[in-house]
């Protein structure tokens, strides 16, 4: 598991879609995850330390977990299948520890409220992690070392991979 931090939430000026950018704590790899506007707002409100007159859904869930004697231990972005990310919330109670399946956007919104670590599996970062140019914020090509011994087929970018990244690249370019 790789520890991550919330780097930013970005909004596309063309279609107003939101993406949360998680940064690997010990390197310069980033994990962009497209999220809905409500989840983006819930994360941003907490990161900016803003107060809202009534609890948001993620505040409510954190309160329910706490009032039932549980604590959120960490969240984990654990899988990526068909361009869909999966996450788990690790909740501890006196008797046991449970992992609850959820969307990464909800998991991150809970993590920033509970001030708990955010992790991503190495496999997820290998599939979807990117490097960003620090000046432009645009994605850089993947780097491979000479001892990786990867075949051309393993390193060649397939058309379907380009298509799935095109929305993110268009977003960064806008």
Where do the protein language model's features map onto the residues?
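Divalent-cation
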Residues: 1-174
């Amino acid at each position: 598991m790789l520890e991550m931090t919330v780097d930013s939430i970005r909004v596309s000026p063309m279609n107003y879609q939101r993406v949360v950018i998680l940064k690997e704590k010990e390197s310069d790899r980033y994990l962009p995850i497209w999220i809905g506007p409500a989840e983006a707002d819930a994360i941003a409100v907490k990161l900016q330390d803003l107060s809202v007159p009534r609890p948001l859904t993620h505040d409510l869930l954190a309160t329910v977990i706490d009032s039932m004697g549980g604590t959120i231990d960490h969240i984990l972005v654990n899988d990526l299948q068909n361009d869909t990310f999966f996450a788990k919330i690790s909740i501890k109670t006196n008797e046991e520890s449970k992992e609850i399946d959820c969307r990464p956007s909800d998991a991150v919104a809970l993590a920033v409220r509970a001030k708990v670590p955010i992790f991503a599996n190495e496999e997820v970062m290998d599939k979807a992690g990117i490097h960003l140019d620090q000046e432009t914020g645009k994605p850089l090509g993947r780097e491979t070392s000479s001892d990786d011994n990867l075949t051309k087929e393993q390193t060649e970018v397939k058309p379907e991979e380009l298509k799935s990244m095109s929305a993110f690249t268009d977003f960064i370019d806008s």
